[in-house]
């Protein structure tokens, strides 16, 4: 039997997934069923693009529900404050300066289930996070990214 994949995440990330799951089950699922019912009323389903679209959306919603349920069931809650030992760990917020241009960037390192680059949350599986994990404040690190090496100096590590 295959081992279930573990999804490291913060309590905040788990709560966000639980809210999304609730929304999908109580609102989105009903909306899609209603769209299917309306599309069926148009008659011939063989050339009914509204029906096809609604069925595609239903498949997406049901797939997302299954995915989220699996992530929640296999969640490994990370307490960043507890894990913070002076080194960059999952759940920490890290501020670093790109060398030599001095551009400052700040990211929170989270599990892949809650990564959202638009909110400054990057997956622990991303090249930047992998390059930062295990290092300490003041350290200069070379991070290997698809675009090439990135040299940074870690300025600040905080528990999120």
From Swiss-Prot:
SUPFAM superfamilies hit by this protein: FKBP-like, GreA transcript cleavage protein, N-terminal domain
Keywords carried by this UniProt record: Coiled coil, DNA-binding, Transcription, Transcription regulation
A Pfam cross-reference name: GreA_GreB_N
Biological process annotations from GO: DNA-templated transcription elongation; regulation of DNA-templated transcription elongation
Coiled coil: 10-37
Top-level taxonomic group: Bacteria
GO molecular function per UniProt: DNA binding; RNA polymerase binding
Family, as annotated: Belongs to the GreA/GreB family.
Function: Necessary for efficient RNA polymerase transcription elongation past template-encoded arresting sites. The arresting sites in DNA have the property of trapping a certain fraction of elongating RNA polymerases that pass through, resulting in locked ternary complexes. Cleavage of the nascent transcript by cleavage factors such as GreA or GreB allows the resumption of elongation from the new 3'terminus. GreA releases sequences of 2 to 3 nucleotides.
Protein name: Transcription elongation factor GreA
Source organism per UniProt: Listeria welshimeri serovar 6b (strain ATCC 35897 / DSM 20650 / CCUG 15529 / CIP 8149 / NCTC 11857 / SLCC 5334 / V8)
